[in-house]
Amino acid sequence: AAIACGKLRGCGDKNKADDAAVKAMRKAFDSIPVHARVAIGEGEMDKAPMLYIGEELGKGLLDSSLPQVDIAVDPLECTSHCAFDLPNSICVLAVAPRGTLLHAPECYMDKIAGPSALMNKISLGLSVEENIRSAAAILKKPVQELKVIVLDRPRNESKIRTMRQLDVNVELIQNGDIVGAMRAVNGDADLLLGIGSAPEGVITAAAVKGLNGVFEGKLYFHEQSYQDRAEEILQ
């Protein structure tokens, strides 16, 4: 997938780049010895031609002895960044035992992520200021030296305002909070905070766990219809 869309960097057409990644990832599964089920994918069956939620893939379709897994995929995260040759586009695949990945609906998720040192020290149950001061204390930094990555969206304005009142170094990103969370875990930043996409949140959780970091997510509904859909999916 990465090679396929990488050849289209700078092409100016994000849909073309995304389509190349999707087709390459889907084709690759034909030769992988698993029975995979898409938990997080390109959308509902009626909205995505392949890698749709619930699609079953892999050589395990014809061989019941092969392991059954759930997968969360984003064949090309930050499609526009690839199309215009900007940083932080990635191809993502998370694999877990069958039944262990959250089938997150198309809604928002409030997220917080950071390095392993912050285990049990940061939480969505705390206020933004409490998380900032806790992280600063554990990481032995002045609050003003903390770098916090936040998606630049209206829904995050109150968090951004609070951090700027504390003189935190706030890095606003236009897209790509999966990479943002990985940067926070790896030390290029100190925290990722804010509301983003729920399906990407599941992938982020898997990535952060693999990097031995800290992640917490909570579904966030800005409209009742999204909550109704989530309740239907998660029953």
Language-model segments: which ranges?
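Short acidic loop-to-helix transition motifs that present clustered carboxylates
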Residues: 44-47, 155, 174-181
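Oxyanion/phosphate-interacting regions
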Residues: 183-235
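Short acidic, glycine/serine/threonine-rich loops at helix termini
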Residues: 50-52, 83-86, 104-107, 158-164, ...
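General beta-strand structural signal in soluble alpha/beta enzymes
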Residues: 38-42, 71-73, 82-84, 103-104, ...
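Flexible, acidic active-site loops/lids enriched in D/E/S/T/G that coordinate Mg2+ and/or position polar
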Residues: 18-98
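Acidic beta-strand-loop-alpha-helix segment within the catalytic core
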Residues: 92-173, 235
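Alpha/propeptide regions of enzymes that mature by internal proteolysis
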Residues: 5-16, 21, 25, 31-34, ...
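Short glycine/serine/threonine-rich phosphate/pyrophosphate-binding segments
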Residues: 75-84, 89-91, 157, 178-182, ...
